[in-house]
């Protein structure tokens, strides 16, 4: 499937997801869609809690563990702090990678694609989408472009999702 066709299909699915009123169902659907879009083994969508200066995720594929990370810590925290997309072909070779999440979840991260999600004003990062372990290789430029397109679309929704705890 060509990138434009795949992007169109993903954006259409995002449109269907947008009518979901249940926050947990929306986040689960978003996590699944992101994972399918870039052929990742696992995906996590973090919400930025600016008051506590941390990232929060309760909905991550195949884990019931709530995840909280300080902004600036790990690759997801780095993306939230800098607003930069991070594509890492070997997670354990990158000094920014936080191995503690793998230890807590029992998951082994090989490679990562981490994309900041900007709020509707385009000035504040409101979330981070993190894709882990591209099937059959490392994440490529077209994966990054597609995940960035998803992030741009969901930003206005994520900025209105309350952070728990």
Which role fits each region the language model picked out?
Residues 32-35, 42-67, 71:
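GAF sensory/regulatory domain recognition
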Residues 54-56, 89-111, 133:
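Signal-transducing coupling segments at domain and membrane junctions
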Residues 128-137:
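Short beta-strand-to-loop transition segments that serve as allosteric relay/switch motifs
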Residues 144, 148-156:
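Allosteric cytosolic regulatory segments
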Residues 9-14, 22-41, 45, 75, ...:
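Amphipathic alpha-helical coiled-coil segments that mediate homodimerization
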Residues 1-25, 36, 126, 157-165:
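Signal-transmission linkers at sensory-effector interfaces
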Residues 64-86:
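Acidic/proline- and glycine-rich, intrinsically disordered low-complexity segments
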Residues 110-120:
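A short, aliphatic-rich beta-strand micro-motif
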């Amino acid at each position: 499937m060509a990138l434009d066709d795949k992007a169109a299909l993903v954006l259409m699915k995002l449109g269907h997801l947008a009518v979901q009123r249940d926050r947990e169902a929306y986040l689960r659907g978003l996590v699944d869609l992101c994972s399918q879009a870039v052929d990742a083994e696992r995906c996590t969508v973090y919400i930025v809690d600016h008051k506590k200066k941390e990232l929060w995720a309760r909905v991550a594929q195949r884990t019931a563990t709530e995840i909280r990370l300080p902004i600036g810590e790990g690759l997801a925290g780095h993306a939230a702090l800098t607003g930069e997309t991070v594509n890492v072909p070997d997670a354990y070779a990158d000094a920014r990678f936080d191995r503690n999440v793998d230890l807590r979840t029992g998951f082994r991260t090989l490679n990562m694609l981490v994309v900041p999600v900007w709020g509707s004003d385009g000035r504040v990062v409101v979330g981070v989408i993190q894709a882990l372990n591209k099937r059959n290789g490392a994440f490529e430029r077209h994966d990054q472009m597609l995940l960035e397109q998803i992030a741009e679309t969901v930003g206005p929704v994520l900025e209105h999702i309350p952070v728990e705890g």
